[in-house]
């Protein structure tokens, strides 16, 4: 049995879950999300908990069991608490500003870089070097954060770039001159 997949998911008060075949629809105070479970996996509601089960012990069924349980749990957490990723910008002249709902970055290029907020994602800027990305869909929040990080990856020699808050980068020593 999958160690993750066998754990039931508690349904908090204020959250409504509908299961229609393989489609799991979750409504909560922050919005509603849905996911389609992969082929061999099924879900059911018992005693105010969501149970994710697999029909057999085939390799594919075992691998999809834990994944499906995590996807459904992400929906429940997303509609109740939401997800937030915080990022920091390091470097002389590197800054971020909020323009309406979008972000404008100055990252040493000859032009400012504009990132538009996808539906369901909100940006918040603290000062000129800290930003946070919030939303109810964990996958979408993480994807937007990855796109922003890719704009200017951390430089291992000077430490400049965009990184997640608290992330430690491995610094390298430069060449020594003669």
From Swiss-Prot:
The keyword Transport does not apply. It comes from the Bacteria. GO terms for biological process: cytoplasmic translation. Keywords: Ribonucleoprotein, Ribosomal protein, RNA-binding, rRNA-binding. GO terms for cellular component: cytosolic large ribosomal subunit. The keyword RNA-binding applies. One of its GO terms (molecular function) is structural constituent of ribosome. SUPFAM superfamilies: Ribosomal protein L6. Belongs to the universal ribosomal protein uL6 family. PANTHER family: 60S/50S RIBOSOMAL PROTEIN L6/L9, LARGE RIBOSOMAL SUBUNIT PROTEIN UL6M. HAMAP family: Ribosomal_uL6_B. This protein binds to the 23S rRNA, and is important in its secondary structure. It is located near the subunit interface in the base of the L7/L12 stalk, and near the tRNA binding site of the peptidyltransferase center. Part of the 50S ribosomal subunit. This is Large ribosomal subunit protein uL6. The gene is rplF.
